[in-house]
Amino acid sequence: MTSPLPTPTWQELRQFIESFIQERLQGKLDKLQPDEDDKRQTLLATHRREAWLADAARRVGQLQLVTHTLKPIHPDARGSNLHSLPQAPGQPGLAGSHELGDRLVSDVVGNAAALDVFKFLSLQYQGKNLLNWLTEDSAEALQALSDNAEQAREWRQAFIGITTVKGAPASHSLAKQLYFPLPGSGYHLLAPLFPTSLVHHVHALLREARFGDAAKAAREARSRQESWPHGFSEYPNLAIQKFGGTKPQNISQLNNERRGENWLLPSLPPNWQRQNVNAPMRHSSVFEHDFGRTPEVSRLTRTLQRFLAKTVHNNLAIRQRRAQLVAQICDEALQYAARLRELEPGWSATPGCQLHDAEQLWLDPLRAQTDETFLQRRLRGDWPAEVGNRFANWLNRAVSSDSQILGSPEAAQWSQELSKELTMFKEILEDERD
C-alpha cells in the first residue's frame, strides 16, 4: 500500500518558491555589465517574492494549460483550446488521451514571454507540482504565497485559472470542421483539436525506441550477430511535420520541447509484393529445400541456433525469445503454403513430383476438387501430424549442426518449447483439413 505524501510546511514551500525566483534573478544579474546599476536595482526590486508573484498572477492570464490545441490545425486559427482530463469513453476499444492516465502531461499555450509562470506552477515538490497544491486549496500553499490571506487567495484564483477556457468556447473559420451524420437528416458539426498531450507521449515512446540506450544496445548486438535479452522496434517511413517554423514556442510549450517536430506514422494499406513461387517438384520435402532455404527462414534458423547455444545465460527472456523464433518459423511455413496455393490446382499429381504424400496433401489442397482418392486421403489421413513431425525433425536438424546443442542440458527445455509450438502448428493444419 502506498503511503500518503507528507504535507509540506508553509515555510518549506515558501523557501522553495523563493529559491526558484532567486535562481531566475541570478541568471539575469549575471548578464549585466558592471556599470548597469539601475538595471540591477530594478531586477532586485521586481524579484522580491511578493512583487514577482503579483506580476506572475497578472501574466498567468496570458497562458492556458491544455491537452488539446487548435494552432497545429492552422497556425492562424483563433479559437478555444481545451484542458480535458482523461476519461474512459463509453465505447471500449477506442484509443485516445484517456489511456494515458497519470502519464498525461499537460501542454501550455499563449504568450511565450509568460512561460516562466508555467515553469513556476510546474515546480515539483514532494510528488506534486505547485499547481496541484494550489488546486487542492492547500492552506500551507496559500500561506507560502503571502502572509496576507486575502492576497494569497486572490493569487491562487489567478494561478488555477490557467486550466480554464478563456471566454466562451469558440471555433474559427480556419479550423477544420467535420459533418458527422445522425439518424435521419441531422448531423453533428465537429471541430477536431490536436491531441497535444497524447502526441507528446507517443513522440517520447518513438524517440526512446529509435534513440534510447536499450534500443541502441540491442541494435549493436544484432550487428555483432550476438543474442540479446530483448529486441528493438523500427518505425520505417516516418514523416516529420513541422509546427511553428523557426519559433515552435509560438505553437505550444510541448511543441517547443519537440523542436516543432510532429512524427507521423504511415497510415497506408500494405503494399504486397507478389513473390514468384515454383511448385516443389524435385525433392521429397519442402522443409529441407524450397522452404528451408528461403532468406527469411535461413535467418530465423541461424538466430535460433545461436539462442539454443546460450546455455550459460538461460533466463526467461532468452527462453521467450526462442519460443518467439519458433513461432515465426511456423508462420513462415504457413505463409509459404499459402503462396503455393496460388498455383494451378493439381500440380502435385504431375508424374515428376517427388514430394512426400503428406506434404502434397498439405500444400495442394484444391487438388481434392478433381481427385476423389486425394480427397479421401486428405479427409481421413493423419497428414497434419505427419507434416508437423517432418517440420519438427527438419527444424531440429537445422538448429543443431553441432553436437553441443543435442547433448546439452538445454535439450529438454528446447524439446518442451518446440512441442508447445508444434501442437499449435498441427492444430492449424487440422483446421485446414476441410
From Swiss-Prot:
Phenotype on disruption: Mutants lose phage DMS3 infection-dependent inhibition of biofilm formation while there is normal biofilm formation in the absence of phage infection. Decreased production of crRNA in the presence or absence of phage. Disruption of the entire Y.pestis-subtype CRISPR region disrupts crRNA production but does not alter phage resistance (possibly OLNs PA14_33350 to PA14_33310, and the flanking CRISPR loci), indicating this CRISPR is not involved in phage resistance.
Keyword presence, Methyltransferase: no
A matching Pfam family: Cas_Csy1
Region (Disordered): 76-97
Protein keywords: Antiviral defense
UniProt-listed GO biological process terms: defense response to virus
InterPro entries membership: CRISPR-assoc_prot_Csy1 (IPR013397)
CDD domains reported for this sequence: Csy1_I-F
Tagged with keyword rRNA processing: no
More details: In this bacteria, Y.pestis-subtype CRISPRs do not confer resistance to phage DMS3 or MP22, but instead are required for DMS3 infection-dependent inhibition of biofilm formation and possibly motility.
Oligomer and partners: Interacts directly with Csy2; part of the Csy ribonucleoprotein complex with a probable stoichiometry of Csy1(1),Csy2(1),Csy3(6),Cas6/Csy4(1)-crRNA(1). A Csy3(6),Cas6/Csy4(1)-crRNA(1) subcomplex is also formed.
Role description: CRISPR (clustered regularly interspaced short palindromic repeat) is an adaptive immune system that provides protection against mobile genetic elements (viruses, transposable elements and conjugative plasmids). CRISPR clusters contain sequences complementary to antecedent mobile elements and target invading nucleic acids. CRISPR clusters are transcribed and processed into CRISPR RNA (crRNA). Cas3 and Cascade participate in CRISPR interference, the third stage of CRISPR immunity (Potential). Involved in crRNA production or stability.
Family recorded in the similarity comment: Belongs to the CRISPR-associated Csy1 family.
Protein name in the entry: CRISPR-associated protein Csy1
